[in-house]
Amino acid sequence: RQMCIRDSSADETKGEMDGYVVVLHTNDVHGAISGYAKVAALKKAYEAEGAYVLLMDAGDFCQGDPTVSVSQGKTAVELMNMAGYDVTTLGNHEFDYGYDNLVNLSKEAKFPIVAANVLYQGKVAFNSNQIFTTPSGVKIGVFGLETPETATKAHPAKIKGVTILGGKSMFDCAQAQVDSLKADGCDYIICLGHLGIDKESIGNRSTDLLNVVDGIDVFIDGHSHSTMKDIAEVTDKDGKVNGTLLTSTGTKLASVGVVTISPKGKVTAMSAP
C-alpha cells in the first residue's frame, strides 16, 4: 500500500503577507541596546507571515550608552549582527572613534555599510549601494547618504582623509545613484540617509535633497531624531516630498519604522511600538 505524504512546506511559507516586502528601519539608536531584541523579534514575526523582510539602520548606532561607547561601537555591531540587520548607513557619531575604527567595525559587521557621499582619499570609502532581490524577483536598490555636517561635528583628526559631499555635490551623487540602480533593473529605490529635517541643517536636509532628486521611492531618514509625527509636518498629505515617501522613527528604539510594499506596488509607512 502506498502512503501519500503531503508536502506541506510550500503551504507553511504561505502567510498573510506572502509577496509583500517589509522594510524595518531604525535610526539614532545611540546605544539603546536593550531594544535590539524587540527589533529581531519583529523581523522574525513578519518573516513568519511570509513577507520578505529587510532590516536597515540610518546611522548613529555606535555611540551613546556607555556599553556601546566603551567598546567604540563594537558591542552595537555585534548586537546588530544578532538582530539580523541587512544594511546600514553612517551617522556623524560613527566617526567619534575615528575612521580606522569605523573600517574595523565594517569588517566585523555582517551587513554592508552604504554611504555614497563618503569618500576616503577621493574614493568611496565603504559601499555606495546594495541591491536585494526577493524570491519572486523584485529588485530593491538601497543607497546611503551621510550628513555633510560630520565634517564640522567630528574632530578633524578623526576624519583625516575623509571627504563628505554636501549640497549640490551630494544631490548630484544621489541622482547618479538613482540612475545607476534603475539601469541595474531595480524596481524600487530606497535612500538610507542620515540627513534630518532640522532648520540648522538647511541645504543638506532630506527635504532639500528630495526637492531636486527624482526617482527615490522611499527615503529613510535619521540625524534629527524625527518621529513620524515630526515628518508629517514637512510632507504632503500622503507623507511624500516631491513624490518620495519620507519616514523616520525617532531615537533610542522607542519605535521601529515599518515600510510595506504590497505585491501590487503600494508603498506605505508606519511605526511599530
Feature annotation, model-predicted:
Residues 1-5:
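Short, small-residue-biased leader/transition segments that mark boundaries at the very start
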Residues 11-273:
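Acidic, metal/ion-coordinating pockets
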